Amino acid sequence: MDLAERLDRVEAELRELRDIEAIRHLLSTYGFNADLGRVEQYLDGWSDDGVYDLSEDMQLEGRAALEGLMSDPTGFQKLQIENRSQHLVANLFIKVNGDGAWAEGYSVVTLAGADGVKIFAAGYNHWDFVRAAKGWRMTRRLRRVIGGPTWGGDVIASYLEPAN
């Protein structure tokens, strides 16, 4: 491998690492924005046609639906989540493929109440991303709660790369 090829390889690896870090940052700020009720910043993390697949029975499609989730004054987000929660993402791994990417990880949401802090939800997540003019944006988030009907190895394994 000559110097030019080595330099091309290093540049490609650096670009991928920067993309991975940008996606990791997006997921971190996404959680903070949900916790703090920062609607516009929350929405900025999504593509305009983004889909949030919360459960087998609840999917939100598009910016208007996501905005409704965050800004409905009588909704769960405003009454229970905002300024009372912590969204924590763990065991995160990210795969970039050109202008698309996906991430996998677990999440835990804690809620503070009169009787202390309790785990509200814990589960598996799969995110899809697209590179947009202003950086990476989520196009889809699939969330499945531990103990739900589609929780388990089959859901997780369906997104994992084949073993080499």
Segments from the language model and where they lie:
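A solvent-exposed, acidic/Ser-Thr-rich amphipathic alpha-helical stretch
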Residues: 39-107
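Short, charged/polar micro-motifs that form catalytic or ligand-binding hotspots
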Residues: 32, 56, 119
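Surface-exposed helix-capping loop/turn segments at secondary-structure junctions
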Residues: 37-41, 134-135
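A beta-strand edge to alpha-helix "cap/lid" segment located at domain peripheries
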Residues: 2-11, 78-164
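Short, low-complexity N-terminal intrinsically disordered segments enriched in polar/charged residues
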Residues: 1-32, 36, 44
